[in-house]
Amino acid sequence: MHEITLSQRALEIIEQQAQQAGARRVTGVWLKVGAFSCVEASALTFCFELVCRGTLAEGCELHIAEQQAECWCDRCQQYVHLVSQHVRRCPHCNNDQLQIVADDGLQIQRLELE
């Protein structure tokens, strides 16, 4: 379960940003998770709540959005976007030999601070 490690790293960054802004509390966090990152949203939510206990982010509202993966199709010679790691076929030519170009893992998109 790498969700715990991702949650810990995200919290470190969130706390740094909150302290730099002089915030007393983090009330909301918006995360974007790559489609092929193998991150389970429910596990990430559980782990994030766990690591936030006793911190500025305890009790904050967590919002998770999934990001499409950008892939290159050699057969079509074009970029395609895929939402699920379970469907790795080009929507134009049905090629299953796609090269993943961008799937940005986990990104902190926005923080809500008090």
Curated annotation (Swiss-Prot):
Pfam families per UniProt: HypA
Keywords associated with the record: Metal-binding, Nickel, Zinc
Binding locations of Ni(2+): 2
Chain residues that bind Zn(2+): 73, 76, 90, 93
Single GO biological process annotation from the record: protein modification process
Domain of life of the source: Bacteria
GO MF assignments: nickel cation binding; zinc ion binding
Functional note: Involved in the maturation of [NiFe] hydrogenases. Required for nickel insertion into the metal center of the hydrogenase.
NCBIfam families: hypA (TIGR00100), PRK03681.1 (NF002979), PRK12380.1 (NF009046)
Family, similarity comment: Belongs to the HypA/HybF family.
Protein name as it appears in the record: Hydrogenase maturation factor HypA
Gene: hypA
